[in-house]
Swiss-Prot record:
Signal peptide: none annotated. This is 4-hydroxy-tetrahydrodipicolinate synthase. GO terms for molecular function: 2-dehydro-3-deoxy-phosphogluconate aldolase activity; 4-hydroxy-tetrahydrodipicolinate synthase activity. The active site is at Y130, K158. The lineage of its organism: Archaea, Methanobacteriati, Methanobacteriota, Archaeoglobi, Archaeoglobales.
Length: 289
């Protein structure tokens, strides 16, 4: 259920910065036939600046509108808050919850283990750990992941450390049914080669059909085609991180006529200079004329 190409969805906003639910529906129409599941209300969905009510409403809307499996963002640096969010995401109709490692307070490995264990004990839906040290200031090590994999409803990890040795070690030392998903578009193909099962993707918001083509080529054993697609998509992977995510991907969606709106403060719109670079890449992929 949770393999393949899974977009980390943007949350489109209206001019007054309220959530644009019609925009979400429009983006779902663009995504659904190309992707395997959906992640609303994560980092790319600007969860950090959504109210609790908005957060849950976005997850609920996606779960009710789409026929695809939904992994709802539910992380917090407070264990009590993460438990509450995970319960609410479950009630909203998500098939799984994704929990970023607690940030800022920097717990040690035992604290991280107890955090995830506590959340897992309070919900019945599967949980995916989200490791992104560049944002949280803390790394989920292979040793810790091995322990977490023993908890019944922790089914996998979104790995965005960028450390292929660590990723390889996680795959090597966890059970075969433990799912590792790339959290870095550029590393999707290398991680698939190591035994990863897919990607939670920013680029899939923009080019879901091309991400699907790369993934399916790999699964079908056409490694040469998968490699060609990786190289073709690399400029997109790069330009979508020319500024803080999701600033560039929102600009790309605007240029393509999809729903995005401006990011909420403290994030600001992409500069004109960087916007031109986004345009060039979109044109090269025939996503805009």
């Amino acid at each position: 259920m949770f393999e393949g190409v899974i977009p980390a969805m943007v949350t489109p906003f209206k001019e007054d910065f309220s959530v644009d639910y019609e925009g979400i529906a429009k983006n779902l129409d663009y995504l659904e036939k190309h992707v395997n599941a959906l992640v609303p209300a994560g980092t790319t969905g600007e969860a950090a600046t959504l109210s609790y009510e908005e957060h849950i409403d976005v997850v609920r809307y996606v779960a009710e509108t789409s026929k695809l499996p939904v992994i709802g963002g539910a992380g917090s640096n407070s264990t009590r808050e993460a438990i509450w969010l995970a319960k609410e995401v479950e009630k909203a109709g998500a098939e799984a919850a994704m929990l970023v490692t607690p940030y800022y307070n920097k717990p040690n490995a035992e604290g991280l283990y107890q955090h995830y264990k506590a959340v897992a004990s309070e919900v019945s839906i599967p949980i995916i750990v989200y490791n992104v040290p560049s944002r949280t200031g803390i790394n989920t090590t292979p040793e810790l992941v091995r322990r977490l994999a023993e908890i019944d409803n922790i089914f996998g990890i979104k790995e965005a450390s960028g450390n292929l040795k660590q990723i390889s070690e996680i795959i090597r030392t966890t059970p075969d049914d433990f799912v590792l998903l790339s959290g870095d578009d550029f590393l999707t193909l290398p991680i698939l080669c190591l035994g990863g099962k897919g990607v939670i993707s920013v680029a899939a918001n923009v080019a879901p059909h091309l991400m699907k083509e790369m993934y399916e080529a790999f699964v079908e054993g056409n490694i040469e085609r998968a490699r060609e697609m990786h190289h073709r998509l690399t400029p997109l992977f790069d330009v979508l991180f020319i500024d803080t995510n999701p600033i560039p991907v929102k600009k790309a969606l605007q240029l393509m006529g999809l729903a995005a709106g401006k990011p909420r403060l403290p994030l600001v719109e992409l500069s004109e200079e960087k916007t031109q670079k986004v345009k060039e890449v979109l044109k090269s992929l025939e996503l805009i004329s």
